[in-house]
Amino acid sequence: MSAKKSPEEMKSIFQKYAAKEGDPNQLSKEELKLLIQSEFPSLLKASSTLDNLFKELDKNGDGEVSYEEFEVFFKKLSQ
């Protein structure tokens, strides 16, 4: 999938993966991994990349990524 997606498309992608387990408004680390593997596979060249990405995205340190936190990632990809 191209990183050039509209904000609406990215919100839909986020919601699809966030709904897999737990809070449907948050991505767990496993949900983020599934999203990245499916939508942006070139970003996961090493398993440590996911850990680093998750730490970077989880700004409030609650162990999950909200849409607002994910949106920052999407904006970086779109540049």
From Swiss-Prot:
SUPFAM superfamilies in UniProt: EF-hand
Boundaries of every EF-hand domain copy: 13-48, 45-79
Protein's UniProt keywords contain Repeat: yes
Residue numbers bearing the N-acetylserine modification: S2
Entry GO CC: apical plasma membrane; basolateral plasma membrane; cytoplasm
Pfam family, one: S_100
PROSITE patterns: EF_HAND_1 (PS00018), EF_HAND_2 (PS50222), S100_CABP (PS00303)
Residues recorded as bearing Phosphoserine in the entry: S42, S47
Gene3D superfamilies given in the database record: EF-hand (1.10.238.10)
Keywords: Acetylation, Calcium, Metal-binding, Phosphoprotein, Repeat, Vitamin D
Chain sites annotated for binding Ca(2+) 2: D58, N60, D62, E64, E69
Misc: The synthesis of this protein in the absorptive cells of the rat duodenum is vitamin D3-dependent.
PANTHER family: PROTEIN S100-G, S100 CALCIUM-BINDING PROTEIN
Name the record gives this protein: Protein S100-G
Source organism of this protein record: Rattus norvegicus
